[in-house]
Design a protein with these regions (language model features):
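Non-catalytic accessory segments flanking enzyme active sites
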Residues: 19-70
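Generic structural signal for secondary-structure transition and capping sites
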Residues: 40-44, 91, 216
């Protein structure tokens, strides 16, 4: 795609042969504007979780790119996602984060919509509209496609886009590491608490790229490792288990998804963790044993940071989260982080994990604040005229990816780079 050269945008932004990527992609306002039309208006985006709307009339205000949307359950129990904008003059019809209602009423002129999107009330319908307004033409704008997968809700404005599971492809197994139970049972995850939200001064692609498989920034979190802020009380991560695994970068190029994952050997036995809390340690010991008894490739995988194109980050390990990088402008991103836990986990386990998630994540979290500082200063340092002349380098692993990677009988999809020696 090309743009007016006077607007500061040049062709040749990505050189696949040399691994050079122009900084313009991360700081250019015109590119950002095109992304809203060509990426966010056509992609599958994460909306929320069905546990946020368990009852008829429940709603949750979410986002799709720059658009405000409403996730709600109608009186018949069906799930909908609507554009949060009145068809009359465009005012938001819902200004609360969540709740329960029978109708969404626009505070501007009073048009009212049912939880199924139908226009059910128009002030002065007889007196001013002479009963001639066709209310069926002015339903709330609804997404073209909707998919509920293991409790998560995804939506797409593009009716011609492939179905969600086709969009996921073989990357589905990595999302399952979050949504399935720690013991391997399908779809056992539930949201823990509310949604953590904050704004960071950088382009949305900085965090998205970071979670797409950047394995080279552990130095940023060195201080956290020294503190021993991990769930076991010994380090930020349980390195003992990771040290016996194969560390892999997995990319599904035709869909844009990427992740880091760890592949355990066949004969691996669960290692002790959460030693400072015997009840929590016993729960996860039992779950690990059950998981390895169940058939399926995921019993040998340890999840790590990943990204579902375009803007949903995975973190299947503790903290077990999905994060959404909502674009606000070319230079600002709103982060929404959703935390997960097994729905039938004992209350002490949920409380323990809640405390750890808060300690780890968000603008006050001991780890994530390091990431935010990196993204903030990388963005601001890339906006100048001189800085834009010098591309970023993405040469790590170039020429060393393999298709159909296999180790001890377990195959990985997509293009895989073995990073075991780089741990």
């Amino acid at each position: 795609m090309q743009m007016n050269a006077t607007r500061g945008y040049r062709p040749g932004l990505v050189d696949l042969a040399s691994g050079q990527v122009s900084r313009e992609i991360f700081v250019n306002d015109d590119i950002y504007a095109q992304e809203q039309e060509r990426v966010f208006a056509r992609s599958w985006l994460f909306i929320g979780h069905e546990s946020q709307i368990p009852n008829p009339g429940d709603f949750f205000a979410s986002r799709m790119g720059e658009e405000s949307v409403i996730l709600c359950r109608d009186r018949a129990g069906a799930v909908h996602v609507f554009l949060n904008s009145c068809r009359h003059r465009g005012m938001k019809v819902c200004r609360y984060d969540d709740g329960n209602t029978t109708v969404f009423t626009c505070p501007y002129h009073g048009w009212s919509y049912g939880t199924d999107g139908a226009l059910v009330g128009v002030p002065f319908f007889r007196e001013a509209y002479h009963s001639e307004l066709d209310r069926t033409k002015y339903r709330l704008v609804e997404v073209a496609q909707l998919c509920c997968y293991k409790g998560t809700v995804w939506a797409n404005w593009d009716a011609s886009a492939p179905p969600f599971l086709e969009h996921l492809g073989e990357f589905r197994r990595f999302l399952d590491l979050i949504l399935d139970g720690w013991d391997g049972r399908e779809g056992q995850a539930e949201l823990l608490g509310g949604v953590q939200k904050w704004i960071i001064p950088c382009n949305w692609k900085f965090p998205a790229e970071n979670f797409s498989g950047d394995t080279y920034h552990n130095i940023s979190h060195r201080s956290v490792d020294l503190v021993g802020a991990g769930p076991s009380g010994r380090s930020r991560r349980d390195y003992g288990e990771l040290n016996v695994a194969r560390k892999l970068h997995v990319a599904i190029p035709d869909r844009g998804h990427q992740t880091i994952t760890y592949m355990l050997p066949k004969d691996h036995q669960p290692q002790a963790a959460y030693q400072n809390s015997p009840e929590v340690a016993e729960y996860f010991r039992h779950c690990e044993e059950e998981r390895r008894r169940r058939p399926g490739a995921n019993s040998r995988l340890i999840g790590a940071p990943g990204e579902i194109f375009p803007n949903v980050a995975l973190l299947p390990r503790q903290p077990r989260t999905l994060a959404v990088w909502h674009p606000v402008s070319a230079h600002q991103t709103e982060v929404w982080r959703f935390f997960f836990v097994d729905r039938d986990a004992p209350r002490p386990v949920k409380n323990f994990l809640r405390d750890y998630y808060i300690r780890y994540s968000g603008p006050a979290g001991m780890t994530e604040q390091d990431d935010m500082e990196n993204w903030n200063y990388a963005h601001s340092a890339s906006r100048g005229v001189i800085a834009r002349r010098h591309p970023y380098t993405y040469e790590m692993g170039m020429g060393h990816a393999v298709e159909n990677y296999e180790w001890e009988g377990l195959r990985m999809p997509g293009r895989v780079v073995d990073l075991t020696k780089a741990q």
